[in-house]
Amino acid sequence: MSSSRRRKSFTSSSSSSSPSFHSPPPTSRLRPRSPPSSNTKTSPTSTTPLATNILLSLIAFRLVNAFTVRTFFQPDEFFQSLEPAWQIAFGENQGAWITWEWRHQLRSSIHPLLFAAVYSAADVVAQLLRLSLASRADLLVAAPKTAQAVIAGLGDFYTWKLARYVYGARSYEAWATLALTVVSPWQWFCSTRTLSNCLETTITIVALYLWPWSWSFETPVRKKATRAASRERAQRGPEGSDSLQRLRQCLSLAAVACILRPTNILIWMGLASVAWFRTSWDRRAILVREVLLCGCAVLGLSCVVDRLFYGSWTFPPLRFLYFNIAQSLAVFYGRNDWHYYVSQGFPLLLTTALPFALVGLYRALAQVRTFGLGHLQSLVQAQLALICVIMPFVLSLVSHKEVRFIYPLLPSLHILSAPPLVDYFLPAVIRSSRSYTPRRLTLIFLLLVNIVIALYTTIYHASGPSNILSYLRQQHELHAPAAQTPSNLRPSVKDPSPHGITAGFLMPCHSTPWRSHLIYPTIHAWALTCEPPVDQTAAQKATYIDEADQFYANPARFLREHMAGGLRHISRKPSYLSAQPRPQHPSTTSTNDASHEWPDYLIFFAQLEPTLQSLLRASSYAECYRTFNTAWHDDWRRKGDIVAWCLDPAEQQAWRSATRQRDLENRERQFDRIIESFRKEASGKRDGKLSPFRRWFSSSSSVAPSSSLSLSWPTSWRWPWGQRKRTAWLGVQIPQWTRTRPSWTAWGGDWFGGWRQKKKTKKLLERDLWS
């Protein structure tokens, strides 16, 4: 059959069939798809035992992932989600740090409301189980991680389901997509964090799975077809209720994603544009109608929720765009090169999958010109590739860039990476030929690299912030027993009674979590801020310096001017040991105070330690805790360990004793290693086994006492190879009589041999003693 006949038959068959939202998934080119049973009606949303097992396994996997993450990534993980959620769940006076974005109504309250419900449920569980306050604190720390792990597992699951729809239920590409998601270092590092971008990513991939991809598959209505003809087709067979329900779910989720992150609209504008230009008029009408209905419903619900949260009517997405674009406040937090997303964003997201993603993007974009003749698989790949190009391109026009801004594209990139990955590694996996050994070794190497990156970034790098807050929480439980009674579960930070410990953070702003990890409202703490110049002129913005920059520009001046009492009047005792506790200011929610009280615990990075040792040498502060943070850091202010100084002499002495004990243990372990090496060396020598290096010196230890012992160099040094006697020196022949070795020590051989024998015997005794 010629290509023209195939095209004609395809067009006629597609136009005669009734429109549907989802055509059957295409056949995989590696494994054919088995047809569904004729007596069973399969639904795209139906779940099978396999799908259920995959979902539960992914959720369990992400739970392990969530509780493995011990490192700090971005402040928004806490200050844009958990801190406002803490205030919603427990009240305004519970010590949550509400940043400037919330005071200026730039964020939607939908995301914090999710975790507020999680906090409330965890608190109820703690009360029902009558947990101790320490156990309750651990539960409140773990609850958001558990919720986010479930969200991340759903994102992985729907990534796999969309790949099954594109490539076929039994295709290798679908399983390769799942494998890419599971072994992705970025997914392990970021997916279980409470960032709004993580929730946005999950919502986006679920909505993409529900999107009517078949709309762009069928040819559009010809020009001679009128709108009346389209209405007649719509009257013959209306869309199925199940397909319409899927469309509404898709558009509702897309609207929620756009409310959370307004930049998510770039994804849906691209997909809607393709569907609009490639579908019929009746479907265009349906699309417009459902977009208006679902969009208005979600928007109205969001406005009501924000009205209850903020206390006034507001529209956060519009204010977000106004502050970040019109006032250019995002630039205050850094500028990036125009090629950031290409040179850094995609490599960070994909890591070892980057080459396969580039090949997949190229293949998909090369098929754009064949929209009308291709398969549904090609069309879906092309549209996914388009949004993976359009979104970074538009976001590159903004000066401030972060890799998490394009995080919602990662599932689509994994789907596009699957075919090149299968093409390259599948023969090496299913075949036993030795010619594929390099590919097998490459696969093992890539997996090991992913594992190393994932574990290093989630356990080792930047692990100090969570450790230091756990230490402060433990110190509060130890030194503030009066604040740990059941009647004081929710005291106010503005109420100095009961009184807990105090802490001050001399760090760059938002370097640690806050109330979500401190938990106890009676822990009074303050930290340096970096709020942007809101509602200021261009000249004022040019000279504006935030509090953290003021401190690092001149630490001595800052401490003299911004600390109560300056550098001369510093407390000698911690507040929990004083007869009259120092007054506490509610600086946990705002650090714009003119001065800060000297705290019981002073927290800072090790980079600042020499400066503070010089400034506070006359004070009672001394080290009482130190935890590892990073081996390297791009910010010079955050280099080194995190150090805690305290005023309590008992804590200082306990830390010195513990440090001394650790040093002694390290020395003992080192000494044990030395003794073990001596023991192995001695046992090897008794067995007649010498190291190659010691064989060179074996002649000196095997010399028997003799009256004719020669002390010339060759008798005490024996090379592994033969030694040639020199017969000429500088071209002059050496006489024969000078080549002999006279025993010039023969006169003292008996005495010298006896001395050597005694020395050798002594060495043997010492060796037996060590062994």
UniProtKB/Swiss-Prot annotation:
Keywords on record: Endoplasmic reticulum, Glycosyltransferase, GPI-anchor biosynthesis, Membrane, Transferase, Transmembrane, Transmembrane helix
Main location: endoplasmic reticulum
Regions that span the bilayer: 49-69, 251-271, 285-305, 341-361, 378-398, 410-430, 441-461
Pathway given in the UniProt record: Glycolipid biosynthesis; glycosylphosphatidylinositol-anchor biosynthesis
Highest taxon, organism lineage: Eukaryota
UniProt region (Disordered), positions on chain: 1-47, 575-594
Pfam families xref list: Glyco_transf_22
Annotated membrane topology: Multi-pass membrane protein
Name the record gives this protein: GPI mannosyltransferase 3
Organism for this UniProt entry: Aspergillus fumigatus (strain ATCC MYA-4609 / CBS 101355 / FGSC A1100 / Af293)
Gene: gpi10
